[in-house]
Regions:
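Mature-chain termini and adjacent capping regions
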Residues: 1-174
């Protein structure tokens, strides 16, 4: 009788663990699709407004907060109304489907057509407002500036910049 009770106890416990594992797997976010060598061109009124390139994209549109993940590098090229381009690269990015935000992380570099460059570890890009911002440490380099700081806020062309907690040098015309 003892072996029979032990057998049923073993079966019951092992089944309940399997059910728990299964439930945890259902809760885990698993991409519903993936794609390799992404090249996505966005247009506005027949003109190219942006180009996104990445070696890999994971689609998590089944998540509670849907998003696309770019785990192995991303390059985004933004064009202004004069067809000048701003290039953004990073090691990793998440593009949130229910908002206009792209969260870029790791070796983030933004370069404009004037060769103004922002370097940081994390940056948000708001596609709707065409706005860049971070609260992380940054370095901003242009022909007459080399600024270090923590916190940066700007339009995509670096025409309206707000630096926070800065140090560095700026050339002034007298």
């Amino acid at each position: 009788m003892k072996p029979l009770i032990l057998f049923f106890l073993f079966i019951f416990l092992s089944c309940s663990q399997d059910k728990e594992i299964f439930n945890n797997l259902k809760k885990a976010e698993i991409p519903i699709s993936s794609a390799l060598q992404i090249n996505s061109v966005h247009t506005d009124s027949g003109k190219v407004s942006s180009v996104l390139n990445s070696p890999k994209m994971l689609n998590f549109s089944n998540a509670i907060f849907p998003y696309y993940e770019f785990p192995n590098h991303i390059e985004v090229i933004l064009y202004d109304k004069n067809n000048n381009k701003t290039k953004i690269t990073s090691d990793y990015a998440i593009s949130y489907s229910n908002s206009d935000l792209i969260d870029l992380r790791g070796n983030v570099i933004v370069s404009t057509h004037l060769r103004d460059t922002l370097i940081t570890d994390q940056l948000y890009y708001d596609r709707g407002q065409e706005w860049l911002f971070t609260n992380f440490d940054f370095r901003y380099v242009s022909s007459d500036k080399d600024i270090f700081g923590k916190g940066f806020d700007s339009d995509k062309s670096f025409e309206k910049i707000k630096f926070l907690e800065v140090n560095g040098y700026v050339s002034l015309d007298e």
